[in-house]
Amino acid sequence: FGQLEAGVTDKSWADEFFVSASVSKIDKELQTGSVQSWVYGMAERNTESANVSVRYNKADFLVKDLDVHASLSQTWDHSQTVDTVFRKYYWDGSYIKNASSEIRGRGKSLRHYKRPMTIVRSNAEYRFNDKHSLNLNYVLNRAGNKQYDEMDKTYVPTNDVLVKHIVGLSYNQSFLDGKLNNVFFLKDYINHLKVEQTELSFITGSDAVKPSNTQSYWGYGVGTRLTVSEPWAIKASYEHSVRLPIARELLGNGSTIYPNIALRPESSENFNLGLFGNITLAPSHHLYYEVNGFI
């Protein structure tokens, strides 16, 4: 693993601007499958990765009281799963000959996975005055999943793509000299999935989804915090939350996790209520407490 970073601070055009690059290489012997009783002896997963990232921060961007934070990360990941031995192994290292390979239980395979990933994060906050501010947040996560096999000529190469856009808008209030704070927020979760793989559709669910589809899901909520005095403060919140599946859950990891392409986002209704404060026991001794309840 190696990493290099360079940048500048306190410039007229940027409070902070950094560029970094890193490379890594991992050679991993696989010990078990999805269950501990499924023992591997010669299966391997080798990975080479490279990353370039940029981050930028600027207060009073273009206009006064507009703060901007942005970052970009691009990763190139190439993994190779080696499954070329017709053996069945046991925990003591012994084995017997088998009619199929260790991982897939089929013919010999030297499967390649190229998974480029792009992550963009940006945040802009504008303060109207000491009591009101508006915040806009955007996150892009794009993961590719190109697969091909050097040895299994029956395998059809595929190129899947998962793209997630999350756009959030929040309005913040502060009253009573900062003792009462409210936040109202709205989020749009956009999920785009393009799938070419059809192997093991009875496991992956690839036959149950369209080859290319885009879905949008809304989240929203409100939160408030009231400080009565330093020892006594109360906070409460409600959120209709959404969790989009990550790339590993949808597309698998190429060895121990099968793809689950038909997996849908999770949603929940969350209520939180809490009591917290800071009690001064002596001039140099303070006790902070917090009690929370949620459903």
Spans of model-derived segments:
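Surface-exposed beta-strand-turn/loop segments characteristic
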Residues: 1, 29-33
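Outer-membrane beta-barrel translocator/channel fold
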Residues: 1, 223, 233-245, 265-269
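Face-selective signature of the C-terminal outer-membrane beta-barrel domain
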Residues: 5-25, 47-205, 209-219, 225-229, ...
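Short aromatic-enriched loop/helix-cap "lid" or pocket-rim segments at secondary-structure transitions
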Residues: 32, 82-84, 247-248
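Short, glycine/charged-enriched secondary-structure capping and boundary segments
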Residues: 34, 150-151, 198-199, 249-252
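Predominantly the C-terminal beta-signal and adjacent terminal strand-loop region
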Residues: 40-47, 251
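Outer-membrane beta-barrel domain signature, especially the mid-to-C-terminal portions
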Residues: 197, 207-214, 244-267, 295
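Membrane-embedded beta-barrel scaffold of Gram-negative outer-membrane proteins
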Residues: 235-239, 266-295
